[in-house]
Structures are given as structure tokens and as C-alpha cells.
Amino acid sequence: MKRILFLLIALAVAAFGGWYYWQFSQRISSATVAGLLPRETIFVAQIPDFNRARDEWEHCDIYQLYREPAVQDFLRKPLGNVPKTDAVSQTLLDIEQLAPKNAFVALTSIENNNPKFVGGFHFQGKQEEAERIIGKWRSVLMGQNSSLKREKVQYQGHEIEAAKTASFTIATAYDPPWFFVATDAADMQALLDRADRRSSDSNNRLDKDEAYRSAVSRRPSNDVASFYLQPKAFSQRLAALRAAVGSTPAPGEGTMIEKMRCITGSMRFENGKIHDVLFLGMPKLEQNTTLTRSSLSLGTKETFFYLAMLLNLGERMDTLNQAAAFAGTKIFQTLSDSGITAADWKAAFGIELGSLANWPSDSHWPSLLVTVPVTDATKAQQIVEALLKAEEDGSWTATEKNGVRYFSKQSAASFVAITPTIALSDRILIAGLDPASVEESMKRSRGNSSELADSQTYKAAAHLLPAPTNFFAYLDMVQLYSRLDASLRPMLLMAAAFVPAVAGSIDPTKLPAPEVITKHLSPIVSSQRYDGDGYMAESIGPITLDQLGIGAAIFSSFGAAAARHRGLAVPATAFPQAPHPSPTP
């Protein structure tokens, strides 16, 4: 009987111990990333679930395009020139095995220009299994550096392993199922305290900060990556710098960063598309003004790019004049010399800027248009004439047709022949690269319908995002790629025939057919609005507008560097750059 009683007691103790350990481990594993960080954290980036993000990436449109057999066949030659390494593939396999969740890296402070970082992730499996992979990474990172001083410290039941040199420290520790890394041993101890719920100050956590809570409430629950930035540290440094030089801004004035309470961004996959969201917590800058997209009436079925945004140039004439002077031009100084003030500009023009790019199928290059509403035709004409006088050669010619004033100028010979033209009516100013497109656009501005607005492609794309209040952009990737292929494919074939460097890099005969590419493409749309207490900027497409802009900049820099290395000329192009949405100053 005693043996049975003893056995029951032992089982009860074991069950209680197992339950307690399970509860403790669940409490640790359920700790949010924000709950692990100090309240004054400046920046944190997070990937909630690496394997889920990778799986969704492999099902998105742009990855499916990359996996097309024809695309792989075309890329085989250029990729063959790149040194092969298995390190990246092995690292991805290791990460997949760890199955990291809530992976994060955070900038917690900048003291004496010494940034401090912490990071970590929730791993799958046992600590010993994780250490086999992480230990390998640690060895590669540390290498055979003889100046490294390694030490192990016991702290609250955890082993902190630190590697130190005279200039930096890297501390790592396990708190299963978490692995943590920090650039300061004291920060590592604080991180472990928060993970184990031992922190004496429960309010000193990022998730207790009101600005952070407001920002992350705008973040979708199904994102694959996100970040949060607290600009206060930078605005305080700017204020200190102003005080040091004796500069005091007037009440209500200040830089954009001083007006921002917080910034957060996220990315998710949505029906094969990439969807970015950016939130800027700050006061509204535009008063009683909203985007009308009135320039949409100029669009045609051949329009592949459309932009509308609020841009109050009248408020920024002094800044623009300083920038122009720095660039070596006196375009805005001419307005001042002519007695034209910022008030005159605001009276002459509306604040909604529009831009369109059309590419007819029978044209080798696109035509670009820029539009501004006219509210006072007389003042607008005075401003235009004053600006044109800034041209030193004075080669602009003026004509009038059907009540519209046209100003045009023949540019010097270049890779793409252009004739800058400005049309001014009592309702709108249109600037373009050739007289024909400007005149046709002026005719369309008098109508009430738009081929672009009526197209199903545009309608479907525009409805993917909430209605904008101060920024909207649309880019038809199918039409753009089709036109680029028709114009550049013959040039690429010719270049490969006469330029050995091109022939050695790619095989243009294996360039995929346009339909192989375009079946994976769809329009890119970007929309920005003021929502409650900040600006919400969203973009969706096979890639987003910001990603397109960053990619184009990287590609251009690499292309220019390669051309300089090989002694090739890099012709200028007339393609529009991807704009970045920002609040209207």
C-alpha cells in the first residue's frame, strides 16, 4: 500500500513539474518581440515566420516568372559568369531547419555615437540541435581572430558567451526556445530579464509605448516582414545641433523628421502580389485639400504610367531656389528678379501635380507629360514667360492656337530627339517632350471622359487600394514590358553582334518571348492618404513602387559601372523614374 501511495505521489510531483515547465516555456515562447525591448528602442525589424515567408515568396508572381524555363535558359549564361558558391544555399537550408519565428534585430540606443544592437529568434527543436548550426555560424563570423577575447558568464541560470575586442563585443545566449545576440553584455542581461519576466520595471518595454502601439495597430496580422522606427532620437540630435549654432525655429516650423512621432512599415503577399504598407505618424500638412486626379482625363489606352500628387511649390520656392543655386542654375532666382513671389505662384497654379507617360505601339520611345492646374491664367503666363527667360540662349518660340499658348524649343542632338513644349490654357499647363503629344493632350483636357480611366485594367488596379488623398501612381507593367521588348530586342541583337562584351555576357537569341514574361505581370499601384493621426502609403503589384525604384537605381549603378569598366558609352533615356510617395510639404 505504501509503495502504491509513494508511486502516486511521485507521479503527481512529476505531473506538476511537467505542467509548470510547460507553462514556463509557453510564457517565454509567447513573449512578443516588443516585450523584449526597452521602451526607448529606436529601430526594430522583424520576420514573424521565416519558413512561411519563404513559402509565400516561392508562390508569388515574380518568383514564378523567375522559375519559367525560358527565363532560366536565358539567365544561364550571365549567371555562369558569376562565381559559384554553395554558402548561400547551405545557409538557407540551415535557417529552414531552425524554422526561426519572431526573428528580430533592434537598435536600442545610440550613446556617445556608439550604437547598441540586440537581436534574436525563436528556434525549433532542442538547444543542442540549434547550437550545431548557430555554432557553425559563430565560428565563421569570429574566424581565427587572435585578438578576440572569449569568456562565458553565468547569469540567472543562463550561460552568456561573449567575444570581445577593443572596439566591439558580441554576446550570445540561449533561453529556449529563444536565441539572443547583443553588442553589449548588460543589454543581454536586460534582454534575458524581460524574456523571463524578471524585469523590475514592467513599463520599460517597447510594447508599453503609446507611439509604438499606435503604429503597430496599422500593421496587418499576416505580414512577412515589418519594421518600426522612432525618429525622436534623431530629432533630439537635430534640436541640439540647432541650439549649438543658435538657430531657433519659429513656432509651428521644423523639419519633417521633427514632426514625425513614429514610422512603421510592413510587407505581405496577397494573391501572388507584394503589398507594402508604410505609416508615418504625424500631423496633417495639407489643409482642406484632397487629390482629385483631374489629369486622368489626359490618359489614353496607350498610357502606361500615371501619377497624381499634391505638391505645393509655392510654399517651397525659397528652398527650391537654394537647391537650384547649388546646382548651378538660377531658374527660380529669375522669378524673384521679375517681381514674382510665392503668393503669385500660389495664385496662378493649383497644388495638384500630374504626370503621364504614353507609348504608342508605332513609336520607339515613350512621351512624358507633366501637368499643373491653372487658377489664374494671367499670372500663370507671367510666370512661364519669366521662367523661359532664364534660358541663356533664349531659343524658345511662342505660338497661339485655339486660345492656347504654346512654347517650344529644339534641343541639341541626342540619343532620343526631343522638342520640349509647354502648353498653357486658362485651365491647365501641360509640359511634354514633343509638340504633337502636348497638343493632343490639351485637346483631351477639354473632354469629360478618359480612355485610361475607363479601361478595366486601370479600374481593377485602382480598386486594390483605398482611395488616395494626396498621392496616387499607376504603372501598367504588361504594356511597359511589351513596348520595351519591341524597342530594345533589335538593339540587343545588334549589340551582341558587334560588341564582344555584350555577346560574352548574354545570349539575346534566348531572350524569352514577351508573353512568357507578361503573363506573370500586372499593374503596380501606389496610394497615399491621411488616416486618423498619420499618413498611410500603400503599394501593390508583382513588385511595389519603392522596390521598383530601388531596383532601377541598383541596376543603373551596376550598368554604368560595367559600361565604364568596358569603355562603353551609357546613353541617357527618357524613361520616368519611380516616384516615392511622401507627405506634401
Residues of each region from the PLM?
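Charged, amphipathic alpha-helical scaffolding segments
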Residues: F6, V13-A15, A171-L191, I263-T289, ...
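Short, surface-exposed beta-strand/loop micro-motifs that present aromatic residues
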Residues: V33, F104-S109, A162, F168-P176, ...
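Loop/turn-rich, solvent-exposed surfaces of beta-rich toroidal or solenoidal domains
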Residues: H364-T375
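Flexible, glycine/threonine-enriched loop-and-boundary segments that flank and lead into catalytic domains
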Residues: E400-A417
